Amino acid sequence: MARYIGPKAKLSRREGTDLFLKSARRSIADKSKFDTKPGQHGRTSGQRTSDFGLQLREKQKVKRMYGVLEKQFRRYFEAADKKKGNTGANLLSLLESRLDNVVYRMGFGSTRSEARQLVSHKAITVNGQSVNIPSYMVKVGDVVAVREKSKKQARIVEALQLAGQVGFPAWVEVSADKAEGTFKKSPDRDEFGADINESLIVELYSR
């Protein structure tokens, strides 16, 4: 299955929530469209979705939010299920530890897609070493930085300025001037307010 390259706002509208696929500079008018499905004019009550449909839709939403395809997403779930603690929370913690997501959380990219490009184009280092694998798992204490020759890229400068206005998550410590940050700890479930019901995903894979 190929990665989706179509209009990103369409995916958010399909899921009925902001998947954070576009910059935070999106207008309020754009965000108000999320409760209208693609191709749908005005609000309709529609038919009641089955439990399986709800579970499947939640999985699709999270996959799209983090830019992960099915095979890899399944591996994350299996790894989360083997760890101690809540499987759903473990799954989200693993997704949050991906390098492309950490780059996004540190504000080097304004979206996860942009952060993934920065990683793939070798603009990012981990502990001083270039890493170009978006799925690389960042560990507690790792220092993630923008390579020196990439620090003046307009999109990185703008993304950091925007992130500075919005604020950084508690689990990363960022030096905007140096364009580097430290992954302080794995985030607790209640530390990021994403509109996710991970229990539905656990139920789906437990069928």
From Swiss-Prot:
Biased composition (Polar residues): 42-52
Domain S4 RNA-binding: 97-157
Membrane found in the keyword field: no
Keyword RNA-binding on entry: yes
InterPro entries given in the database record: Ribosomal_uS4, Ribosomal_uS4_bac-type, Ribosomal_uS4_CS, Ribosomal_uS4_N, S4_RNA-bd, S4_RNA-bd_sf
Gene Ontology CC, one term: small ribosomal subunit
Gene Ontology molecular function terms on file: rRNA binding; structural constituent of ribosome
Keyword annotations of the record: Ribonucleoprotein, Ribosomal protein, RNA-binding, rRNA-binding
Chain positions covered by the region annotation Disordered: 30-53
Family stated for the protein in its record: Belongs to the universal ribosomal protein uS4 family.
The protein, known as: Small ribosomal subunit protein uS4
Gene coding for it: rpsD
